[in-house]
UniProtKB/Swiss-Prot annotation:
Designated name of the protein: S100P-binding protein
Keywords recorded for this protein, A-Z: Nucleus, Phosphoprotein
Basic and acidic residues biased stretches: 80-90, 231-241
Compartments in which it is found: Nucleus
GO cellular component annotations of the record: cytosol; nucleus
Compositionally biased spans, kind Polar residues: 255-269
MF annotations from Gene Ontology: calcium-dependent protein binding
Subunit structure: Interacts with S100P.
Native organism taxonomy: Eukaryota, Metazoa, Chordata, Craniata, Vertebrata
Domain of life: Eukaryota
Region annotated Disordered, chain positions: 1-28, 61-135, 170-292
Nucleus found in the keyword field: yes
Keyword Nucleus: yes
Pfam family, one: S100PBPR
Length: 422
């Protein structure tokens, strides 16, 4: 239900709708006959968050006027329009530019009084279609919400310098340990009557010196071979100690020992020539500790033997000529039976039995037609000679474990009786 806004001196900024859908009349707006029932609270209306007194409304409007003076370009409505307030029945409609709406999150108008905040033009929602705010926000809370400060701890370079100093001291200790070891190797090589130039070439080619200067020309093959033999023969016990040292150097890639040296016309890393010696020597140490040479062989799984098929000796075989003769005789009997049946009223089952009886008696006893069920021939599945037992003999052979056959009498086999002889 929509009603027009009517200014009045008594309301001074608040115009209420009729109570409980009461009939509205223009005569009630006369100054002489004012209806005091409009000033009373309607059903369900109380002094809640959306109920303001006249003094509170005036204070809020003064605050808005002050903010408009600071920002004359603000997109707020004029003061005359903001004084017209409209309330819906039981909170179902949203008033136009009410003081509550200025504090609501749906209002984009000027609401802060500090000149540091940026203002957007005011956005008002249409009556009866916008979402109703569940709780009115306090103006001071809204200002504090917009002025949240983010504090970040300043950068402290001393902390990073201390961490870097620790890493540098650790790397320097590792490099000093590594450089001490080649010095002993150089002394051993000098004892083997090697010139100092050759010893410096060997140490520099291995990439152990901090200068890591590569030789201009290819080194002598004798010096390389002697140095490799010296490392493999005299450093077998120190191989376990050498591997963690080089792993630490690989972890700290900031050391100056990561250069490459020229060897036989190709570039190789200084660590690639050292690690294979230590790894191979560690394997030899493990083999010496075990007392015998370890041969790593691939273990095979369990081999299942393949059963070979046994040859069947007792299965009768027929030549193709014998099979062709049996086929022709069978066809002749079938055609003769169709042309001159024995009994035309015997039916399909009787006719089949008569045909099978003829085939059974006319052919050789060694040959059995696949559809002939008068004899049971399991020669293909048995490997021993067939033995015939009576029922009692069969029970005695099975030690009378089947109690249901104890009371059955023994009876001999009877001859096969065809259906047409009955």
């Amino acid at each position: 239900m929509m009603c027009s806004l009517v200014p009045s001196e008594q309301s001074s900024g608040t115009s209420l709708l009729p109570k409980d859908n009461a009939p509205f009349s223009w005569s009630s707006l006369d100054e002489d006959e004012l209806d005091d029932s409009l000033l009373e609270l309607s059903d369900g209306e109380d002094d809640g968050h959306f109920s303001f007194t006249e003094e509170q409304i005036q204070e809020l409007l003064k605050d808005d006027d002050l903010s408009n003076e600071h920002f004359p370009w603000g997109g707020g409505l004029p003061s005359d329009d903001s004084r017209n307030v409209e309330k819906g029945e039981k909170g179902s409609q949203i008033p136009l530019d009410t003081p509550q709406e200025k504090d609501s999150p749906y209002n984009m108008g000027p609401e802060a009084e500090t000149p540091d905040t940026f203002k957007l033009p005011q956005l008002t929602t249409s009556v009866g279609h916008g979402p109703t705010p569940a709780k009115s926000l306090n103006r001071r809370f809204a200002l504090e919400k917009n002025l949240i400060k983010v504090t970040v701890a300043p950068f402290d370079p001393t902390v990073c310098d201390v961490a870097l100093d620790k890493d540098k001291t650790y790397v320097s200790e590792v490099t000093s340990r590594v450089t001490e070891k080649p010095s002993s190797l150089g002394e051993e090589m000098r004892e083997d009557d090697l010139s100092p130039n050759e010893s410096t070439l060997c140490t520099e080619s291995e990439g152990i010196s901090p200068d890591n200067s590569a030789s201009d020309g290819p080194p002598l093959p004798s010096s390389n071979s002697n140095f490799q033999h010296t490392v493999s023969d005299k450093n077998m016990s120190d191989s376990k100690k050498a591997t963690p040292v080089f792993s630490q150097i690989l972890d700290h890639s900031e050391t100056p020992n990561t250069g490459s040296s020229r060897r036989n016309g190709s570039y190789k890393s200084s660590f690639e020539m050292k690690l294979p010696v230590s790894s191979s020597s560690s394997k030899d140490v493990l083999d010496k500790d075990s007392g015998k040479l370890k041969v790593h062989e691939k273990r095979l799984g369990k081999v299942i033997p393949v059963l070979q098929a046994k040859t069947r000796t007792n299965v009768p075989t027929f030549s193709p000529s014998d099979l062709e003769k049996q086929k022709q005789s069978y066809l002749r009997n079938v055609i003769a039976h169709i042309e001159d049946p024995v009994d035309s009223n015997q039916g399909t089952l009787g006719e089949l039995c008569a045909l099978m009886d003829q085939v059974h008696h006319m052919h050789n006893q060694k040959w059995q037609h696949p559809s002939d069920l008068t004899r049971r021939n399991y020669a293909r599945f048995r490997q021993k000679s067939l033995q015939r037992y009576s029922l009692t003999q069969w029970v005695d052979r099975n030690k009378r474990s089947h109690h249901r056959f104890q009371r059955l009498p023994d009876f001999p086999y009877g001859p096969f009786v065809s259906s047409h002889q009955q």
